[in-house]
């Protein structure tokens, strides 16, 4: 790593089986919303915190926070529930997949504590928007008005969240490339 700031983010990862299920939802919706830029299977994750520009020393600090904090969190079941849109169905820019209440609360709590640890270490975190647990399925360049019933709504699917990763995000003309800087397993539930 050189001294240039890097784009990076912390995210919960999914198992290959869960990614395959999520990708099947994307495939069923691509023809229903062809103007959207759909997420590739290898980029499926839940972003807990995005950092637009961290210096290498800050990257190392974040790695240490992740190594010290996330192994204390127990792996947890998470049910993928419904499809939604940001900012609204009338002005959709992001199509997302939401979670059951319990796992959403675990994600919110983990993000809050992680952000507090970063702040204590002098690392600025984005607090302009409250954390809303979701998995991005697609992005739209221009907002569109769509009805929820226009999209394939999946049946509920339960998986386990077992690890967190810290990714570098490199922007390219073909889309972002995510490179894991560190991956840490959550505490295994016995």
What are these model-predicted stretches?
Residues 1-190:
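Histidine-dependent nucleotide/RNA phosphoesterase domain, centered on the 2H-phosphoesterase fold
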């Amino acid at each position: 790593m050189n001294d240039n700031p890097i784009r990076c983010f912390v995210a919960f990862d999914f198992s290959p089986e869960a990614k395959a299920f999520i990708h099947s939802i994307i495939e069923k919706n691509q023809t229903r919303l062809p103007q959207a830029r759909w997420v590739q299977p290898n980029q499926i994750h839940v972003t807990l915190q995005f950092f637009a520009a961290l210096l290498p020393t800050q990257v190392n600090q974040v790695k240490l926070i992740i190594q010290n904090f996330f192994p204390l969190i127990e792996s947890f079941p998470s049910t993928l529930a419904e499809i939604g849109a940001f900012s609204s169905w009338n002005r959709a820019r992001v199509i997302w997949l939401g979670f059951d209440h319990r796992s959403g609360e675990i994600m919110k709590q983990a993000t809050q504590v992680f952000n507090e640890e970063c702040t204590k270490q002098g690392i600025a975190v984005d607090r302009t928007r409250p954390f809303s647990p979701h998995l991005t399925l697609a992005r739209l360049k221009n907002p569109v008005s769509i009805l929820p019933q226009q999209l394939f709504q999946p049946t509920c699917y339960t998986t386990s969240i077992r690890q967190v990763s810290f990714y570098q995000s490199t922007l390219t003309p073909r889309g972002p490339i995510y490179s894991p800087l560190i991956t840490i397993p959550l505490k295994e539930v016995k």
